[in-house]
């Protein structure tokens, strides 16, 4: 049979050869590092037979795919077995990989806490030390059920029973065959390939994420090919904890959450300063780029959500209200809007539109609500109530490319001003199930791609990952400690204008549906503020800082001068506060430095007489004495985004 390799070269191998046979045929070095194989785009175990002509690539342990497989094997074959060894009555649920790691969910009569992680790690090391080979058996549904019924693993039985498969269930064993797990694979050929690992935390998780089901114990871990890479990751985790926006939010008195309004932010004055400043910044950019700001209702009748199609797809995530309307035969059912797009179409639909009116760019700081399960919420990063920097562009097919280019330029400018000089772009193309003709899709995909190319931005294509109603662009930021955040989106939509009867009169005198482009730059204010706080470790750029300047008196006799300085700074639109407390200046400096105040002006008798201020900047132990007018001039300059 003919095997085609990634470089388009080919080799002839006997039918039934494995990926390992191919690796050996290519060279002993490759065979030594091979851990799995990709056959016609599908990952398989290294020793799986290849039966027909195929395109094949070998996955090595030092590749990203190899690392993922190592983590998968570690959770499914090592962590799971260690848990069963230490807690024989425990029941195994699922053990997937996640970004930079893995977890396993188990039901245990004994409490498993973070204090037990070292013990579990030691048991895992014993298992790895065996360097046991891992073998796979393919069995029927009834055979798989029999195995896990015998092993008293009810969660595995549920998974098997709910599967659409009738055969080819994959059971993975180690050499002694004393442990078996159900898994899609692939796995490492043996445990000797496992590198460095660390169990990181224990938490609770509902089976299938449903609060009506059993609460399970979730054990998290991470793994890398070397001690160095593992330590770097653990150092990053430690740094991330220091930067946690929830911790800094409390220290800086920015916001809080409470049980009476789960997932809803209580913004404090300083946090609201950040929010307002960011909103004003975005509003100014949008205004300069031809956007028309609108505001639409938060509570909308279900009829609109049914017409848009969101009622069927989003109902479980909506907050729904019922109102007894006067003289009505039945209650009126409304929903808090989970997104703004159907409402924006209603604004567009007021009046007759001509092709000469297009493009129309609407923007809204839209307050939205979506129900998120309590276990998924995470500070500002995932909430139930949020504000989107939302926008919708109504344009013709011929205008998609120019609108794409304008949007990317605007997004780039905003990200740069906020401190993110680079970003990644992902283009998601047509899925198999879609609406619209191939001609329309060709035109839209080419428009997005051409705009990126003309602006000379690197990008990658995600084939088939677009929405059923149009291709899209995703924009991903990388923060100061290397974490990626998908924020911006640009999504073409051929569906909603049709469903909601959005039209324009074309040059031909006939009515046409416009293309509707959903776009956002920040995503949501709440999440983006969380990202900013963590990116800057609370030390936000001066123009965005919640408290920009604190004037701290050294003695009470200079309080009047401190107030005068504050007023002069406020006249220059600087967020300036005074600290006249009867405390030592060293205490005041420490206190305000801990709250990440960029500039502290210390004022004593000498400063008052000389009309100067002692300037202390965050992160520096040095103090600079400046003439008051010069200090205000410098601070005013720093308050400009482009200073």
Regions from the language model: what does each represent?
Residues 1-93, 98-643:
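NTP/phosphate- and nucleic-acid-binding module
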